[in-house]
Amino acid sequence: MNRSIVIILLLVIGLPAHGQAFKAAVSPLVEASCIDCHDADTDTPLNFEKIGHDLSDAATFRKWVKIFDRVDKGEMPPKKKKRPDSVLKNSALAVLKADLSAANLKEQAAQGRVVARRLTRLEFEYTLQDILGIGGNLARHLPPENASAKFANVAEKQGISPVHVRSYLTAVDAALDEAIALGPKPRGGGRDMDYRNNRYSSMWFDRPMRNGGQTVMRTDDAYVMFSYRREPFVARSDHMGYHFPYPGLYRITAEGVGYQAKTPIGFGLYKASDKHGNTELIGNFEIKPGESRKIELTQYFELGEFFFPAGLSLDAAPDGKIIYMMRVKGARGYQGEGLAIKWLKIEGPLEEEWPPTRTRNLLTGVPIIWLPKHRIYWTHPTKAPKEHLRDVVKQLGPKAFRRPVTDAEIESFVSLAKPHHPKEHPMHKMVRSPLRAMFSSPQFLFHGGQPGPLDDHSLASRLSYFLWKTLPDEQLFALARDKKLKDPKVLANQVNRMLKDPRSNRFVDDFLDGWLHLSDIDATTPDEKLYPEYGDTLRQAMLAEPRLFFRELIDRNLAARNFIKSDFTFVNRRLARHYGMANISGERMRRVALPADSVRGGLMTQASILKVTANGTLTSPVKRGHWVLASLLGTPPQPPPPTISALEPDIRGAVTIRETLAKHRDVASCASCHQHIDPPGFAL
């Protein structure tokens, strides 16, 4: 049978009467300009011999959308191929556009624009933290998101499974454990970390270097460290008998001085957990040569975490040696820079009262008494326990569901509580079952709202999760109750207010993690020998630059063209040194003007972008070109055909990356995308 007849039959079979226009207009274009490269005998992801025309099928609909876009933009057929007749092309595109639009509207009318969207891991964590007044990493208990183009809040990619439900319950249990704190009151005062005289740290002063010793030393009034690579093992607070006994805010104060320092050094503070395997730089304070500096840091710590101090931005000895090369003389013979810690103190948890405010707010109206015999606090109901419980659910329900709750909803959760027993099942345990159910319910996990225009409460919720990643605050709730939020002036004022709130940084961080792929910053680790300058301080500065840059554009309402080329950026001393900029001191990130001939400016030349589009050792024109097309231009290229591997083209004789990719582009199925990917990739 003639192939053109086969194609027409395949495209027409099953078409309703209104689809006959498709047969007449689209099939001739496919036969004339497409089928030679897109049939069963070619290595491309599109095969017109198999594609149907049932636009109610989501996969088929997406295929025809891509076909329309590429033909409409002139990307297909390729430039080397014969161009289609303009009348034929325009007629086919007009019919295809009409069919796609009609199918899309029909789907929206039947199913709505999108499926129900649930809270992301980040939104879940922030919402529970803000409702219960807690901290802690709750997201770690939840499964990874099935992201779409790096964004986790795309409804059609989200899902919920038995694994999700179990994970939500685990996370809620962890949140309630922290929120209901009725143990003995933490001891006041603080803890002095005596690194000079502690038995554990002292044994490292004289131990041979081959056994990990002699990389630290003590002077008459200080403990000196020369590198953070091994010293954390020596200076870990848990090795000195201290880990954080309660979750909450703690204050760390210390005094440090640069030892043998000829340049500014950093006094770093890290928090870590053996249980969860995470280590995070939480503070970096610059100390100038010859000066002593007192530092202070208030930070949230989880139960069981520990911390350690570290010297950062330390230059090696004049002869180029680092501390680990001092096999004989050790730390006392080393001439490089170090950090000398004179004293360090920890205070906390910083609670004004005990049980803490978060516990009293949760157990609203329930008296809490001290039982000296058992050295614990206990709930002591003054009315029927279920009446107390009803008060708790009535208080938290509107926050959890981001809307008013009905009496029936309140009773449905109250009824889940086990019977009260003063000793075996007291009030503070009785409340857990209803709250556990509430915070794992569809009303909490999914964004509400009915089809059609949003009501005021749904609008308040959409706004708060857009800019704050959490539930509305009391001002938004009040405007929603009064039905004033839809007023354009009121809405504009609220957006401006919310953008000035520190919580809007959650939006900035989360959006840039997805849009610019900053979440991939740790996907590769630069080779230490090739890039010894890369470390935690540079990494933090690299991440801060695009976030502060984006924040500046929002706060000052600057033009979008700054994303491509700007006359300013944000740096600190460490990042400026990486960029080769002079006369920048201090670890504080600040806006700096760029000269007209600077290679910096805009997003594309920022260090974080260049890192997430490299492989840790070499630059990658393909990754960088793909990033430009997908993130800046919004035209992500198609994935390669499954039958095409990166090494399949003949690259014999190629030497440079440019020559390698030139050989790659000789393959027809690769050329159509790489002709767009490679040019911006090489520019970067």
Residue spans for each PLM region:
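Glycine-rich, highly charged phosphate/nucleotide-binding loops
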Residues: 56
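Sec-dependent signal peptide recognition
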Residues: 2-9
